[in-house]
Structure formats: C-alpha cells, structure tokens
C-alpha cells in the first residue's frame, strides 16, 4: 500500500454561508430589526472575547453573486466548540432571516514534512512558526476567496497511487508558487478528508482581489493542479466589520 501523508492539525473551521431573506426582513418594523441587530452584536462581542484570549478566531465577509450574501468563518479548538458557536448563532432571532446556502467543515493542517522542515529539530507544536500556521490570526484583508478541492483518483491521474517522494516533489514545486505571493496573499489550508465532500478547503485573503485570479491561474499550470486537482465552487467577498452590519441591514 502507498504511504499516506501525515499532517499536523490545528483549529477546526466552519465556513457558514448565508443568504439574506430581504423580502421577510423588509416586513419587520424598524424596532424589531434593531433588537435583532443588537442581539447579533452581543453575540459577536462574545466571539471577540474568545478571540482575544486566544481560544479561537472569526471573521465575516459579504459575498458577491447569488451563491450567498455572507460568510461567517469561525475557528475553534474542537468540533464541540465549533458546534456550540453554530447552535448559538442559529438560535439568534436574526438567523431566521439568514438562510443557509452552503457550509464547509475542515481543520487547519500542515504537512508533517513541511512542519518538520520549519521546526528544525524541535517539537513542531512548540515552534512559533508552525503554531502560527495551525492557529492562525485571521488578517483583516479587504477580500476573501474560498474554494474546496480534491486530488484526482482517475486512471493514470491518480494522486494517491504516486510514490511519496513524487508527491512531495510536486507539492514542493506547487508551494514555491504560493510563497512567491507572500505579502500579497495569505492562505489557510483546511484538511477535510472524512469531514466534508472535498479533501481540502482553501481560504485566501488579500487587499487586492486580482491577486486571487493571478495565484489561481498560475497554480493551474503547475502539474500538481493541472493534472491532479479537481475544484468545487469559488466564493469571493469583501470584508464586513461588525460595525458595518447595521448599515448592511438598513433598508
């Protein structure tokens, strides 16, 4: 049997995509709308406390197009904690007007090969660089791009039948492209084998949305993607600060 890749795992991730039911929201009187927005604000304040004590992260982006209107991206140290956030959010009054359109579950991962390289001889989980990758601080970048992907298992193009050494070389070459965008694009890779419909969820952040187009285009021509990758839907959006929510929901 071929050797399976080993990974280091960090925070669990939930991408929760919602569509605003504008027709139903418009029927509410302004007083009820304000009460619901205040309740949402208190919820987000509690999320900020969790973030400040280093036990999780979260961000909100406004999504373009008709796949969704919003994405709530939450990271926690366990599936139980992630589920608690999800359930609490769904119990908010405003959640009745935020219709689920898509979701994705993953866990931030780093290949054992890369983690060992970064950590040198020390325990990777104690290395600051490795920990920053596994338990990332989400950057307040203007734009987000999310997409799920898998590796092919199709005849001669079966990623999982390649020898470990060949896979490592392809990933190293692929990674060189990503590193060339350092300072322009920050990425978080979530492993989702056994968690969701694809094998990874990729989240990109940038202040220039065109960088998403550039990096994805360049990677498409790399063999690891051109020959072995399959992609799901792409979602792109703009940063939505908590204090901007009231303006968004004002009719």
Curated annotation (Swiss-Prot):
InterPro entries: CHDC, ChdC/CLD, Dimeric_a/b-barrel. The keyword Oxidoreductase applies. Fe-coproporphyrin III binds at residues 133, 147-151, 174, 187, 225. Fe-coproporphyrin III acts both as a substrate and a redox cofactor. Gene3D superfamilies: Apc35880, domain 1. It catalyses: Fe-coproporphyrin III + 2 H2O2 + 2 H(+) = heme b + 2 CO2 + 4 H2O; Fe-coproporphyrin III + H2O2 + H(+) = harderoheme III + CO2 + 2 H2O; harderoheme III + H2O2 + H(+) = heme b + CO2 + 2 H2O. It holds the Pfam family Chlor_dismutase. Keywords: Heme, Heme biosynthesis, Iron, Metal-binding, Oxidoreductase. Signal peptide: none annotated. Its EC number is 1.3.98.5. It comes from the Bacteria. The active site is at residue 147. One of its GO terms (molecular function) is heme binding. Pathway: Porphyrin-containing compound metabolism; protoheme biosynthesis. Involved in coproporphyrin-dependent heme b biosynthesis. Catalyzes the decarboxylation of Fe-coproporphyrin III (coproheme) to heme b (protoheme IX), the last step of the pathway. The reaction occurs in a stepwise manner with a three-propionate intermediate. Belongs to the ChdC family. Type 1 subfamily. This is Coproheme decarboxylase.
